[in-house]
Swiss-Prot record:
It comes from Bordetella pertussis (strain Tohama I / ATCC BAA-589 / NCTC 13251). Keywords: Ribonucleoprotein, Ribosomal protein. GO terms for biological process: translation. InterPro entries: Ribosomal_bS16, Ribosomal_bS16_dom_sf. One of its GO terms (molecular function) is structural constituent of ribosome. Belongs to the bacterial ribosomal protein bS16 family. This is Small ribosomal subunit protein bS16. GO terms for cellular component: cytoplasm; small ribosomal subunit.
Length: 86
């Protein structure tokens, strides 16, 4: 089953997450099919902390991918931010 979830990167005490489409049997930070965005929870003020390719998320969900709860929350937040800016 395909799932879109967070893959952790960064260093100790400085997390950085990639939003990836991957098989649910793969490890959290393991092999993935496509990187669809990133999330930086400790980004400095004025820098971009979240970017998601919403068209690619829609493509993967249309092909049966599930969103993890954290990714679902981030997608809602980002789509509201994008629609407010437009």
């Amino acid at each position: 089953m395909l799932v879109i979830r967070l893959a952790r990167g960064g260093s100790k005490k400085r997390p950085f997450y990639n939003l990836v489409a991957t098989d649910s049997r793969n490890r959290r930070d393991g092999r993935f099919v496509e990187r669809v965005g990133f999330y930086n929870p400790v980004a400095a003020e004025g820098t971009e902390n979240l970017r998601i390719a919403l068209d690619r998320v829609q493509y993967w969900t249309g092909n049966g991918a599930l969103l993890s709860p954290a990714v679902e929350r981030l997608v809602k937040e980002y789509s509201a931010k994008v629609s407010a800016a437009a």
